[in-house]
Amino acid sequence: MMYTKLIFKNAKRSGKDYLIYIVTMTLCVTLFYAFLSISSTHYHPTIGAEYNISLLAGGMKLAICGISLLLLFLIHYVNRFMLRKKQSEFAVEATLGMEQKTIGLLFFGETFFLLIFSVSVGILLGMVVSQVITAMLLASFGEPYAFSWSFFPDTVLLTVGFFVVCQILVGVGNVRILNKSRIIELMTANRQNEKPLHKSRWMPMICIFYGIMLLWMLEVGAVKYHFYFDPRHPLPVKLMYWGNVLFPALTLLWAIAGAVLHRKIGFSRYLCGLLAGAVLTAIPIFSIAELEKAYFLGFDAPTLNQYLLFGVADILFIISAVMYLSNAALLYWKESKVSRKYHNTSLFLFGQLSSKLATNTKTMTIICVTLTFSICLFVIAPVLTGWSLGYLDSRAVYDIQISSRYNDVYEVENLPDTDYEEITAFIEQNNIEIKDDLTFSEYLPQKSDFYQRVKYDFPPLAIALKDYNAVRKMLGYEPIILKTDEFATHWHSAAEDKDIENYIAEHTLLETDAGTLKLSENAVFQEPVGESIYNLYTDVVYIIPDEIAQVLLPVQSNRFVMTQYPLPFKTAEMLEQLLGRSYPEDPDKDNLAGYSTTVRTTEVNRIIALNFILKASLIYGAIVLMVMCLAVLALQQLLDAEKNNYRFSVLRKMGVEEKDLHTLVLKQLGVWFGMPITAAIVVAMIVIGYFLQSVSAEISAYIGCGALMRQIGIIVGIFALLMSCYFLSTWLLFQRSIRSNSDSVR
């Protein structure tokens, strides 16, 4: 009972010191409960019969719990911070005769009590935030949102259980640490000095690993140059091949020369050379994706993934080098001019910054990398999900659609000739009301094209004018008109205007087995009509007169059905299973056609569920990583404040005003918060800019620049809010720490 009272007393007395811990854990619990609430068995949002929410419950629970394991590191770090902060207090208690095991258990009880408080508040806030998640989910299904206060017992139990288990695991470790610690170590822990920056092994080890990566880059670049380089390549492709060999080679030579002559060169100059080489090496690496898209270089997926790995290694090294050189530049700037060092309280500020330079440099590098990754996740999440949902609108255009594929059929006699009577029987059996039903074929302009099987060189298909106009009528578009000797084109919605213009300029005539057709004056159409009408690796379909189509070879059979009302989910699932059995995508026997089938209800459910899981997981992971970074930055500064508060009391005794002390604190926090955050924002902007440029066509076709900018604005607001909260909390606690110490000294 006495120990219980002591736990509550210590927790109450140290509440302000633990503000960062309480805020961080409350925020994590809030997010955990809010995102996990939609996986509850008691969660039943109001959606139509064509939707099934159970598809995403299991995946959501697995994804959120998996990402939440990162919080174990955060809980461990925060507990270690509190342990270090109270080491001198523990030493006094041990000196007075209290057993170290008892001290450890009291500390565990104190942190456990604070965790329970944070979990309780977090769950209450999570009930509110879960409404935002529900609104996101209903918006994904196209349903209106209405506020409804909900309580999910299974989610509460899972939330409490997860965080309690994490705290127990960390708490047991803390008790063991205290049991093994000597009293003298606890007393003198705050007085230990660290190695200066130039003696830190952190950056030399990174340089060694980067040198190994450079050797690998050089080997891969030389192999690709030997097997893929062609003098007929355009200049940008040649520069890419040359750069992937030359820049890694030069950077590797500098790395070897610098390692041999490091005493003459100096580590900072050596690192500057490596940094310049890393930047140059990254340019051809990141150009590969764009060049592959523009010129079809033929790189396979393992090669592209390999270069992606090289690009990530370059970015990580650049961040590490920039962080190290920034801190080295701080020392150089201090020593370069005596008047600068001794101006006002600058000497004290430089002493504060340089006292933890080695440790803070390593921490800031890790934080910068993690924060960069977090920002990229934030921006990439809406792009990927918006792209997928926009693509869904182009893919699942019809309620029921099925198309054959001739690409695995090697004899004309084996081409399918079917009207898909199983669909007709299913419709009649289930009394499904039909709005439109169209069965038609697509053709090859020339029969000889049937034997063209080069992967990226399949010929475009052709569709008869009456069938094309019937498709347009189903989708609410106006019909088109062609003369008997003309043809037109229909393009994929993601095709770029430049590519369309170039293709049209080169294909003003179309050679067919029934004669030559000329391009119509109104020759380009690009409304979404589904994915299945295009041949593999093509973005265009020829529209030809009906008389011409009757002469050509039909190679693809399609059936598109529009129902009067959306299919219920169970009915759609039965139909999908029937089509999968009757018309397999990959038949067991060779030389038989495969089929592409899409039932809109099941496809929409599947894609929306997967997209929501992806979007929620990326956003949740990004927020968790961001909270971890900001919490570590804040706790590191508060720990330094605890160790160095005597210095501030000396300044007060020397007559330094409170206003100047506040300025000193702001400058110190500005450096340690500003450097990693600024570097992360700059690197993230470069990476995100490259990513957005590479998918600009998809963004324009499926998302829209306005919608993307609104989402990015929300992301910037969340980041600014989190950063402001942590910076302000750290500044207030830092001020309190140095003020309370000054009062105790007096």
Predicted feature descriptions by range:
Residues T30-T41, Y77-F81, F113-E143, T155-K180, ...:
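Small-residue-rich transmembrane alpha-helices
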Residues K16-V23, A34-G66, M82-R84, H233-L250, ...:
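Peri-transmembrane interface segments
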Residues L392-F612:
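Nucleotide-cofactor and metal-assisted catalytic machinery
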